[in-house]
Amino acid sequence: MKDVNILVEALPYIKKFHEKKILIKYGGHAMIDEDAMSSTVRDTVLLKYVGMEPLIVHGGGPEISRSMDKLGKEPKFIKGLRVTDEETMEIIEMVLVGKISTDIVSQISYHDGKGISLSGKDSRLIFAHKKPVSKVTSESGGEEEIDLGLVGEIDCINTDLLEMFLKNNYIPVISPVGIADDGSSLNLNADTAAGEIASSVDAEKLIILTDVPGVLRDPNDPDSLIQRIKIDEVPDLIEEGVISGGMIPKIETCVKAIEDGVKSCHIIDGRKKHSLLLEIFTKNGIGTMIYK
């Protein structure tokens, strides 16, 4: 009887999100657990079979750093952003496009779905420009220039390409690599790419799978989860330090996506099995929802 009740509870959400686009951002830190990854991919295929249109944008930071270590290349970061020279860019593409994306597509096929691996360079899916050199105040009080190298800022998304694959029942799996005007590759922030794609395709939801339960009022207390945040509450939560560190850019991505038309954004723990289904098909969901 319990299983029947679960199915009955899911029905309104299956109807509500039928033929709606769901953008799933799968973070690199959430991919470390292979069982959870397999579960997430299987659940994504299920979304497709019940009539939704899921798209995946994946990260891969930990895997990129491990590959760089193996190749004797020291990862460098400035304010949390990876400094990207030409050699680093080659490694990033090798890991994101050549390994992670194809692994996800293989998992989709294993679960009887149709996946397609896409880089932002394919048919200029993600057109971008190099992030300008910026000036910041140094520790000594003077100005210093920061050049992140081949790091990009997104200009536009080729939605026609994505719509073509969605109409043919594919699940697009997108690596956050952009293409510049001269054809060169640019390293993109995966959260930002996910937000831009979500708003460009008029996604109903943007779901960010990461390695924390959501936004916690006390980072040491998992029971302090904030379940719902309105976008106009975000500045105060940042000022109070409730939203801090790596959570800030994720929340900022969510705020921009909602301002650009996405109905709601969700930050959930991708390490938890079936977290995707729990978020979409249950009344209370899990994690933190950001909305207007």
Swiss-Prot record:
Subcellular localization: Cytoplasm
GO BP annotations listed: arginine biosynthetic process via ornithine; L-arginine biosynthetic process
Gene Ontology terms for molecular function: acetylglutamate kinase activity; ATP binding
UniProt-annotated site: Transition state stabilizer, residues: 25, 250
Gene Ontology terms: cellular component: cytoplasm
InterPro entries referenced in this protein's UniProt entry, alphabetically: AceGlu_kinase-like_sf (IPR036393), AcgluKinase_fam (IPR004662), ArgB (IPR037528), Asp/Glu/Uridylate_kinase (IPR001048), NAGK-C (IPR041727)
Positions annotated to bind substrate: 60-61, 82, 187
Swiss-Prot/TrEMBL keywords: Amino-acid biosynthesis, Arginine biosynthesis, ATP-binding, Cytoplasm, Kinase, Nucleotide-binding, Transferase
Associated pathway: Amino-acid biosynthesis; L-arginine biosynthesis; N(2)-acetyl-L-ornithine from L-glutamate: step 2/4
Enzyme class name: transferase
Reactions catalysed, as given in the entry: N-acetyl-L-glutamate + ATP = N-acetyl-L-glutamyl 5-phosphate + ADP
EC number: 2.7.2.8
Pfam families: AA_kinase
Role this protein plays: Catalyzes the ATP-dependent phosphorylation of N-acetyl-L-glutamate.
Similarity field: Belongs to the acetylglutamate kinase family. ArgB subfamily.
Protein's name according to its UniProt entry: Acetylglutamate kinase
Native source species: Methanobrevibacter smithii (strain ATCC 35061 / DSM 861 / OCM 144 / PS)
UniProt lineage: Archaea, Methanobacteriati, Methanobacteriota, Methanomada group, Methanobacteria
